[in-house]
């Protein structure tokens, strides 16, 4: 087991994404891969709705480095396969979505499942199991309300489970709200954020920048202690729907 690389916390708007977390659904401590806002360009103004952080098991760094070490940040950012390898990689992942603007659980789940179903249908892999997983996903969110600062946590196991947790203040919950055993759904949730049509180009760019640095500095950066610094992401990327 590799020790976690030295990573920095990221601040998106007023929300801090810590360098490491230990989420429900896994016994492992995960490192922050990258973070950024999700929003829309409305009437010439970029309106931010959520802040998103993607965490990875420390072993993701050497696993991804085998193929991607030596690539520039631009090459990684532009590569569909790079982000696909993150989504499908054999390591634990956590996605945290923190509300900048209020949103109902129904609004959130309907948009996420719409993106997931579109991805599956394009890939020719939408069947009864996925339909049932979508129904369970929507049920988990049906009575939820997310004021600003509230967070959703998705813990994604390489074995296929998707653990869903909620927090009203952004802190890491100790107990999961639901576990959905469907690998395509687990992967599609992250794909909808950082995939080829992902909703957060900022998070994708942050992942490319930070992982590129971890690949390059892997030998020096990996230690038994995680170094934490301030890392503020510039909020300049226009996110399309």
From Swiss-Prot:
Residue ranges of coiled coil:
none
Q: Which residues are annotated as site, described as Important for catalytic activity? A: 108
Biological process according to GO: flavonoid biosynthetic process
The pathway is: Secondary metabolite biosynthesis; flavonoid biosynthesis
Pfam families found in the cross-reference section = Chalcone
Q: Which reaction does it catalyse?
A: a chalcone = a flavanone
UniProt superkingdom: Eukaryota
Which InterPro entries does the record match to this protein? CFI, Chalcone_isomerase, Chalcone_isomerase_3-sand, Chalcone_isomerase_bundle_sf, Chalcone_isomerase_sf
Cite the EC number: 5.5.1.6
Q: Does the keyword Acetylation apply?
A: no
Keywords of this protein's UniProt record, alphabetized? Flavonoid biosynthesis, Isomerase
Q: Name one GO molecular function term.
A: chalcone isomerase activity
Residues bound to substrate: 50, 115, 192
What is the similarity comment for this entry?
A: Belongs to the chalcone isomerase family.
Q: What else is known?
A: Part of the biosynthetic pathway for all classes of flavonoids, a large class of secondary plant metabolites, many of which are brightly colored.
Role description: Catalyzes the intramolecular cyclization of bicyclic chalcones into tricyclic (S)-flavanones. Responsible for the isomerization of 4,2',4',6'-tetrahydroxychalcone (also termed chalcone) into naringenin.
This chain belongs to the protein called: Chalcone--flavanone isomerase
- Origin organism is Ipomoea purpurea (Common morning glory)
Gene name of the record: CHI
């Amino acid at each position: 087991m590799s020790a976690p690389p030295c990573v920095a916390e990221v601040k998106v708007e007023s929300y801090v994404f810590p360098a490491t977390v230990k989420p429900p659904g896994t016994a492992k401590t995960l490192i922050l891969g990258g973070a950024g806002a999700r929003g829309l360009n409305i009437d010439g103004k970029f309106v931010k709705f959520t802040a998103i952080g993607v965490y990875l098991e420390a072993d993701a760094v050497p696993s991804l480095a085998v193929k991607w070490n030596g690539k520039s940040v631009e090459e990684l950012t532009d590569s569909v396969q790079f982000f696909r390898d993150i989504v499908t990689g054999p390591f634990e992942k956590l996605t945290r979505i923190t509300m900048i603007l209020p949103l109902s659980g129904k609004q959130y789940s309907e948009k996420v499942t719409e993106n997931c179903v579109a991805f599956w249908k394009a890939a020719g892999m939408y069947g009864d199991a996925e339909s049932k997983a979508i129904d369970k996903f929507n049920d988990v969110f049906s009575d939820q309300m997310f004021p600003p600062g509230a967070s959703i946590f998705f813990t994604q196991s390489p074995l296929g489970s998707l653990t869903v947790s909620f927090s009203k203040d952004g802190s890491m919950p100790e107990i999961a709200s639901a576990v959905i055993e469907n690998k395509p759904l687990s992967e599609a949730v992250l794909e909808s954020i950082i995939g080829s049509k992902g909703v957060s180009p900022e998070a994708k760019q942050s992942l490319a920048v930070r992982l590129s640095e971890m690949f390059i500095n892997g030998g020096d950066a990996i230690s038994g202690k995680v170094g934490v610094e301030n890392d503020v992401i510039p909020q300049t990327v226009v996110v399309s729907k």
